[in-house]
Amino acid sequence: VLRVVRLDYRALWWDEGRNIFFARLDWVSAAEISVRSGDTNPPIYRLLLGGWMQLAGASPFSVRLLSVFFGVLAVALLYRLAAELYGERVAAIAAALAAVAPPLVYYSQEAKGYPLVVLAAVWSAWLWLRLHRRLGVARSSALWAWFGIATLLAVGAHYFALL
């Protein structure tokens, strides 16, 4: 609920407008303009935003709603990760803190890739934990594939995921 309250209260700002601009372009044009303009943002969020805008429209509320979706999923996955590591009680506390954490709420209200990178990083960590716990057992190639997808999604959303 915190992520949706006043979602369209502020006007779209420069970075959000730039993401919407790139999201409306085809791959080739987006890459060409990105290189010429010196844009350093990876493409995954903008590609997802383009698909989202075809479904939900391009109003400030609808374009920001994608970030809300990613932010809520990140909290749910964080709960799952913490539950496997520390149990249900700690997981509930971790999820509650993440649900109200000001930076996570704030960035879930912008048409930017930050909630996606958080979601993908938590998903990647959860999959890594599952792979690590299967050291003595035959590892699933599907699990490795999902780990690779989650990690590439994180890096494709923001280069800081490499850190």
Task: Set out the residue ranges of the language-model regions.
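Membrane-interface transmembrane helices that cradle and orient dolichyl/undecaprenyl
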Residues: 89, 124-146
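Aromatic- and kink-enriched transmembrane "portal" helix at the membrane-lumen/periplasm boundary
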Residues: 4-9, 60, 64, 71-74, ...
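Transmembrane-helix motifs of polytopic, lipid-linked glycan transferases
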Residues: 65-85
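Membrane-interface alpha helices of multi-pass inner-membrane proteins
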Residues: 94-95, 107, 142-159
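Transmembrane-helix signature of polytopic, membrane-embedded enzymes
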Residues: 78-100, 119
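Membrane-proximal lumenal/periplasmic loop motifs of glycosylation machinery
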Residues: 4-12, 21-22, 28-64, 157
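Residue-level signature of transmembrane alpha-helical entry/exit and packing/kink sites
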Residues: 42, 64, 91, 114, ...
